[in-house]
Amino acid sequence: MVNLGLSRVDDAVASKHPGLGEYAACQSNAFVKGVSTFVTGTGATFGLQMLVQRKLPYPFQWKVLLAVVAGSVASYWVTRVESQKCSNLWLFLETGQLPKDMGTDRRS
């Protein structure tokens, strides 16, 4: 058994897919970026709202809600983009081709 993060992967599976460790590290990095984007985006949006509260006053609960929604949207976008990069990496490690090259027809 090979340890892959918190889970264990059978040796046969790990030997069939030599890029599994790199893919797992990439996905882990993508999720960490997503969480940090959520925290940063929520905090930045909330701080920005506190700065403009004189011109556009509304209740505190709406400020929190708007900040959390903005942080969630930004986090989703960052995680989706980074996960797509990891999927492209996985395809490259498995096939040796980039995903854009897979659809082209090379005739000799």
UniProtKB/Swiss-Prot annotation:
Keywords: Membrane, Transmembrane, Transmembrane helix. The chain crosses the membrane at residues 34-52, 62-78. The gene is TMEM141. This is Transmembrane protein 141. It holds the Pfam family TMEM141. InterPro entries: Tmem141 (IPR026788), Tmem141_sf (IPR038259). It is a multi-pass membrane protein. The keyword Transferase does not apply. It is found in: Membrane. PANTHER family: TRANSMEMBRANE PROTEIN 141. GO terms for cellular component: membrane. Its main location: membrane. Belongs to the TMEM141 family.
